[in-house]
Amino acid sequence: MKSTSESPQVRLTRKLPAYCRVVFDNPPLNLMGPEFVVQFKKIMTELEADEHVKVVVFESAVEGYFLNHSDFLAKLEDLTNLPQGPTGLEAWPDILVRLTRAPFVSIALIRGRATGNGSEIALACDMSFASRELAVLSQWEVGVGLVAGGGPMARLPRLIGRNRALEVLLSSDDIRGDLAEAYGYVNRSLPDAALDDFVDALATRIASFDKWAIANTKRLVNAASLPPDVEIAAGWDACMTSITRAAAQERIRALLDRGFQKPGDVENRLGFSVGQLGA
């Protein structure tokens, strides 16, 4: 029997005792603001405490957006004043590090834009699968004078190599499904019509296995592959410094004047849009 716990921006659904799905649902653009972080943190704590959970799939209910960038119209202090998490990191990077270390398997099902924070969640997950036609991944921050805060500078080089990581981060461009697969940014790019069934079958299969074996295999892979927390913390600190710089504020205002944070072309083609801002 399925049970569901709902909250306005993040929903947790249990398909099986061992298999859960987390749905991001903050229309129209699936922006990440302070309230999203608060709700996501509560769900992470619930999942960590559930000894039955073996696999969690992360997906979106908002057409066109897996999870988008931060909400630049929200008060920054509402985010920075959130308490540090159990890792000792600030609230957002704490969630991502806990997700990577959790004793269950995390899978990102990417349909639509995974921009900034959405890309950071995909990088924190154990696996990610993208819609060939509809997925777009982006670390867009440098294009507006920012440094990303959720750890992509620490994670991407280990995942796709230094040179490709620098291309993704410094171009601030959109990376579509097939190129993301070729770079190793995602596990696979699949036809959109096949994506849901593939991810569900994989999650159901993993959920049928022994949790001790799953958790210990993941723990040992983590020990061989994850960046230390100090690298994640350094990225967050650089992000917070970058937000207050005049250069970043000017570029963000210029984007807002063109339609940023509203449904439309600027958000749909954010990589192109930041490239039009000029020097």
Give residue ranges: language-model regions.
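A structural motif corresponding to the C-terminal end of an alpha-helix
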Residues: 91-106
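Short, well-ordered alpha-helix to beta-strand connector turns
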Residues: 103, 125-126, 186
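Conserved CoA-thioester-binding segment of acyl-CoA-metabolizing enzymes
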Residues: 1-59, 97, 278
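C-terminal alpha-helix plus adjacent terminal tail
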Residues: 1-17, 63-65, 172, 176-177, ...
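Glycine- (often His-adjacent) and acidic-residue-rich active-site loop
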Residues: 60-95, 114, 145
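Short acidic-hydrophobic, aromatic-tinged amphipathic segments that line or gate anion-handling sites
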Residues: 129-130, 186-198
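CoA-thioester-processing core
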Residues: 95, 109, 115-169, 198, ...
